[in-house]
């Protein structure tokens, strides 16, 4: 049926990426997808964003494949190497420089996304450094979990090591990666921040998800962890940590936000933008995950303009 025909299309597209781009993903996600496919079409699906939480979205899958193709092309044009920073898998892209961008991916992301950003940053004299967050990329089975009290200290230690090498450090971060970055770097010298669909009020987001799930604070406090139908697990300890660890962000920051973002309300991002030195760009047709050709075109122009220090005109 259509589902299985499209699954074959997905796998054939992945195989084409491997063949035509000198096997750029052989040591990470694509090999995992192909291996799982031999066991179960459905199991293979879970590693592609279009299958998030078991929902089949053909257009999203194809958009993800196109995005990976663009990343492969960008990687081919940029000098890059794999390394480890504080024993965390990392990449460094670009020629040697005294200024750097630290790239922090979001949930379901991976350090290799930085190649796409690097095609704009490296020509401006930056090196781009990216790490895998816990449970992502080359750390899928890490003992560390994607929790703020684990991820933020890792980012902070990465910054501290980079500060010994670079005289200027900026940060580009996506979604929850932006929140982790603000927690980690709020007291550090950051020359510039670029945030893509940032989570800026985690407490509000968790409370919103509790409303979606019909869960009260009393229930969550009693049960500690409650799985939801939309794929997230509500966690009382997480919410309590968030409330005990507020952050203050006052760095020069450029934000791009989708008008249809279902993770951060418009009033929340606007309030955050007014509270600090932030330039906010809104793509009205954009979503939390920028992935359609139209959305990517806007994101590309925004990246290029802001890396160059220009004012982006939407």
Residue locations for each model-derived region?
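Hydrophobic/aromatic-rich alpha-helical bundle segments in the mid-to-C-terminal region
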Residues: 2-37
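An N-terminal hydrophobic leader/cap segment in hydrolases
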Residues: 39, 43-93
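The alpha/beta-hydrolase serine catalytic core
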Residues: 67-80, 188-271, 275-314
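The conserved beta1-alpha1 loop
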Residues: 102-106, 257
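The serine-hydrolase catalytic nucleophile loop
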Residues: 107-119, 267
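Conserved alpha/beta-hydrolase
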Residues: 121-140
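Catalytic nucleophile-loop/oxyanion-hole region of alpha/beta-hydrolase
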Residues: 136-163
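Gly/Ala-rich beta-loop-alpha elbow adjacent to hydrolase catalytic centers
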Residues: 173-181
């Amino acid at each position: 049926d259509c589902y299985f025909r499209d699954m074959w299309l997905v796998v054939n597209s992945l195989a084409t990426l491997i063949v035509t781009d000198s096997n750029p993903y052989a040591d990470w996600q694509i090999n995992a997808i192909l291996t799982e496919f031999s066991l179960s079409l459905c199991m293979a699906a879970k590693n592609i964003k279009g299958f998030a939480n078991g929902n089949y979205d053909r257009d999203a899958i194809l958009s993800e494949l196109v995005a990976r193709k663009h990343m492969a092309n960008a990687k081919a044009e940029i000098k890059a190497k794999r390394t480890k920073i504080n024993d965390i898998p990392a990449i460094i892209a670009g020629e040697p420089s005294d200024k750097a961008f630290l790239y922090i991916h979001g949930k379901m992301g991976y350090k290799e996304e930085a190649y796409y950003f690097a095609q704009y940053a490296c020509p401006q004299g930056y090196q781009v450094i990216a790490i895998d967050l816990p449970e992502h990329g080359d750390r899928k089975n890490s003992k560390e979990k994607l929790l703020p009290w684990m991820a933020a200290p890792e980012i902070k230690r990465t910054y501290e090591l980079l500060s010994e090498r670079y005289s200027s450090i900026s940060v580009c971060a996506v979604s929850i990666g932006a929140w982790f970055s603000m927690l980690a770097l709020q007291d550090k010298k950051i020359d510039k921040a670029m945030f893509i669909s940032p989570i800026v009020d985690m407490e509000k987001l968790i409370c919103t998800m509790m409303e979606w799930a019909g869960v009260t604070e009393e229930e969550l406090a009693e049960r500690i962890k409650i799985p939801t139908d939309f794929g997230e697990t509500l966690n009382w300890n997480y919410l309590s940590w968030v409330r005990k660890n507020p952050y203050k962000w006052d760095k020069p920051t450029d934000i791009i936000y989708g008008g249809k973002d279902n993770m951060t309300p418009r009033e929340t991002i606007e309030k955050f933008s007014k509270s600090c030195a932030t330039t906010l760009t809104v793509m009205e047709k954009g979503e939390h995950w920028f992935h359609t050709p139209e959305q990517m075109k806007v994101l590309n122009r925004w990246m290029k303009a802001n890396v160059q220090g220009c004012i982006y005109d939407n």
